[in-house]
Design a protein with these regions (language model features):
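Extracytoplasmic electron-transfer domains, predominantly the class I c-type cytochrome c fold
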Residues: 44, 49-53, 59-108
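Electrostatic cytochrome c docking/interface patches
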Residues: 20-37
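Residue-level detector of Asp-centered blade-edge/turn motifs that repeat once per structural unit
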Residues: 138-139, 181-182, 222-223, 269-270
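Solenoidal tandem-repeat scaffolds enriched in leucines and small polar residues
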Residues: 243-293
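Short loop/turn segments that connect beta-strands within beta-propeller blades
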Residues: 158-160, 199-203, 242-245, 289-292
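A short beta-strand motif characteristic of beta-propeller blades
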Residues: 162-168, 204-209, 246-255
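Repeated scaffold domains used in trafficking and secretory/extracellular systems
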Residues: 125-126, 130-132, 173-178, 214-220, ...
């Protein structure tokens, strides 16, 4: 037999349970709808797993510096000088808000980017048959100015501070350009894992490769033969040949059963090595390219 307090509490608990069930069902339906919108309108450019394709990755790590309000504005009105369309007339704003919540949330399964993905992503462009600069400026006194807003870079004459050329880059370059020892080539890393090699003399790209889903920075060896990228996702270091950006080795960032993101990697010229800082393990690593085999 129920006491008076139980008679009062039981209906209240049942009512609250019903409300929670309805909320959960509504949330699930909203999530499913957002997933469907993503598959219908976004997956073609940003990848079925949100890891990026023609467009950038849409994952929390990749969107860390983009506020949700800015992301919504891009969805509504598109992005100038890109293939990002405006959806204001196709999709109600409240549904785009759900899509925003989706892309700023971790996926159910962590995305993978493995050796096969890296090697298949590599693109080579025609190599110009010219070893002299196509400009009159001093090739040893140049600047590369990275423009974050519209994902472009400018080659600047260091004597006159005048632009020599301006060219498009991958989405959200990060970590600063890295120059070859002779100053002819510059290498870029984007937040969504693209490494690009640019021939300054001929003002053209030579090769690109995607080494990860979220990349922190890039370093070039003192002799100019190697590049190494530090990745948050997946947590590893990726060693490349600077000649053609071909993959040499993937170095997982792990110690025992613990894995880590890689915060940064830098060149140690006197030691002919690289030094990497791990974020989730209290360790600093030294990597000697000649010993990676």
């Amino acid at each position: 037999m129920l006491n008076p307090l139980s008679r009062w509490l039981l209906p209240l608990l049942i009512g609250n349970l019903s409300i929670l069930t309805c909320v959960a069902q509504t949330s699930t339906a909203a999530d499913s709808e957002a997933l469907q919108i993503y598959q219908d309108h976004c997956a073609g450019c940003h990848g079925a797993q949100r890891t990026g394709a023609m467009g950038p990755a849409l994952l929390p790590e990749s969107l860390a510096r983009l506020r949700k309000a800015e992301a919504l504005n891009v969805m509504l009105h598109g992005r100038v000088l890109t293939q990002m369309p405006a959806f204001a007339r196709q999709i109600p704003e409240e549904k785009l808000q759900r899509l925003i919540e989706l892309i700023y949330s971790p996926p159910a399964e962590p995305p993978r980017w493995e050796e096969k993905d890296i090697t298949q992503s590599r693109v080579s462009y025609p190599v110009p048959d010219n070893d002299k600069p196509l400009f009159s400026a001093d090739p040893q006194n140049l600047f590369i100015v990275v423009e974050l807003g519209d994902h472009s870079a400018t080659l600047l004459d260091g004597d006159k501070f005048e632009a020599i050329t301006r060219f498009k880059t991958r989405f959200a370059l990060h970590g600063g350009p890295k120059f070859s020892p002779d100053g002819r080539y510059v290498y870029f890393a984007s937040r969504d894992g693209w490494i690009s090699k640019y021939d300054i003399y001929n003002m053209t790209y030579l090769a690109e490769i995607r080494v990860g889903i979220n990349t922190r920075n890039l370093a070039i060896s003192a002799d100019g033969q190697y590049l190494i990228a530090a990745n948050y996702l997946p947590g590893n270091l990726v060693l490349l040949s600077s000649k053609d950006l071909s993959l040499i080795k993937i170095i997982p960032a792990s110690s025992g059963d613990t894995t880590s993101r890689v915060s940064a990697v830098y060149t140690a010229p006197p030691r002919h090595s690289f030094v990497a800082a791990l974020k989730d393990i209290a360790e600093v690593w030294e990597i000697t390219p000649s010993d990676t085999d």
